[in-house]
């Protein structure tokens, strides 16, 4: 066998891998992440605040904001970055009252946003604002409830609920605190919490019940888990003791999601129910998890790059001429009723969808 032939055999797998990864780079006009990201990010500048119980910046707005920030950073869009920063800086002055209190996963995750601003700007005021939101998730409040104290005594956040939503809310603020400080306590917390949620909630098919007492595979709930694992694996040191367990859970979930991708290329409100409607926010989160998996080599590019491209191409048509994403499930609490999930209203322009679209766009723009 000639030396040239052996070299060719050696190179073929790499050529195939790069060819598959190129599926996430070459998009037709109107579908490029640069175009889609710009449309959705600039719309954010015109939006009013979406307040949690009418008082504080809510988590959907936080994630829309951070998505716009990621896009601006990736696109090197200085105008957008400046305007996003100016909008946020009102929270230090006349809008300070809108800073969330620190008593719930849905509120503490706000801290991830100023920490993201710090990572981009290196302005210490963002660091000082963001870190207490990460720290207070592991600091017992004076009015702690018995079950919250039990979680804390086991080394988990007292805000633990065993809702799959938590695995983005907790993960995002702890990983951002780790990226800012390099203090391993933050990544250790996030990893320990994730392993426990995997052990408690992941089913044999790789998907997750909304909660232990709600045996339904809700799309966006699973989306929070998928995106949370992708975010954590990006930050988790290669030799971390929990990395193998988290990677196992991630790969198991991705395999199941690939199986349940609907003919359109997206996923349903209840993932395993073919008669349920297509839901875009969860679909965008799954797409984000696929993108990161292919880019980082966690997922086989030959198998997953085509599925990822199909998903992105299917997401874009749900963006209307006003740059609002359609078919977004409204905010949803857990309920042990299949019909409850079927009947949830879907909205156009809901921030639950706007943010994850931007995560995808920013991720696809990465070199």
Task: Say what each PLM segment does.
Residues 1-21:
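Bacterial Sec-dependent N-terminal signal peptides
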Residues 8, 67-70, 112, 116, ...:
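Residue-level signal for well-ordered alpha-helical scaffold segments within enzymatic catalytic domains
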Residues 21-62, 69-81, 90, 94, ...:
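CBM-like carbohydrate-recognition segments
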Residues 24, 28, 154-158, 181, ...:
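Short coil/turn segments at secondary-structure junctions
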Residues 54-68, 103-118, 163-167, 171-174, ...:
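Aromatic-lined, polymer-binding surfaces characteristic
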Residues 81-86, 94-211, 322:
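Extended ligand-binding groove/face enriched in aromatic
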Residues 164-270, 276-287, 299-333, 337:
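Extended ligand-binding clefts on enzyme/binding-domain cores
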């Amino acid at each position: 066998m000639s030396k040239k032939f052996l070299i060719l055999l050696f190179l073929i797998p790499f050529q195939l891998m790069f060819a598959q990864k190129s599926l996430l780079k070459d998009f037709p006009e109107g579908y490029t992440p640069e175009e889609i990201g710009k449309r959705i990010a600039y719309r954010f500048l015109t939006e009013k605040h979406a307040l949690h119980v009418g008082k504080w910046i809510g988590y959907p707005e936080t994630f829309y904001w951070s998505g716009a920030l990621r896009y601006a950073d990736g696109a090197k869009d200085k105008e957008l970055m400046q305007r996003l920063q100016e909008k946020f800086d009102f929270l230090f002055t006349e809008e300070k009252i809108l800073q969330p209190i620190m008593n719930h996963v849905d509120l503490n995750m706000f801290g991830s946003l100023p920490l993201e601003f710090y990572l981009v700007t290196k302005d210490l005021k963002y660091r000082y604002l963001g870190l207490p939101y990460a720290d207070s998730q592991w600091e017992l409040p004076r009015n702690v409830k018995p079950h919250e104290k039990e979680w804390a005594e086991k080394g988990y956040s007292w805000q633990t609920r065993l809702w799959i939503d938590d695995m983005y809310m907790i993960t995002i603020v702890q990983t951002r605190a780790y990226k800012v400080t390099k203090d391993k306590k933050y990544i250790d917390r996030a990893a320990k919490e994730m392993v426990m949620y995997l052990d408690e909630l992941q089913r044999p098919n790789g998907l997750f019940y909304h909660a232990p007492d709600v045996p339904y595979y809700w799309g966006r709930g699973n989306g929070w888990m998928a995106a949370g694992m992708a975010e954590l694996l990006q930050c988790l040191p290669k030799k971390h003791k929990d990395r193998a367990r988290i990677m196992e859970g991630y790969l198991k979930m991705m395999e199941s999601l690939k199986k349940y991708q609907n003919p359109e290329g997206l996923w349903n409100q209840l993932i395993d129910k073919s008669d349920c409607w297509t839901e875009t926010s969860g679909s965008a989160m799954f797409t984000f998890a696929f993108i990161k998996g292919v880019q980082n080599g966690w997922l086989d590019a030959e198998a997953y790059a085509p599925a990822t491209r199909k998903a992105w191409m299917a997401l874009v048509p749900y963006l209307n001429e006003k740059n609002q994403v359609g078919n977004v499930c409204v905010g949803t609490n857990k309920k042990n009723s299949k019909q409850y999930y079927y009947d949830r209203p879907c909205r156009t322009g809901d921030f639950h969808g706007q943010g994850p679209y931007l995560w995808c766009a920013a991720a696809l723009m990465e070199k």
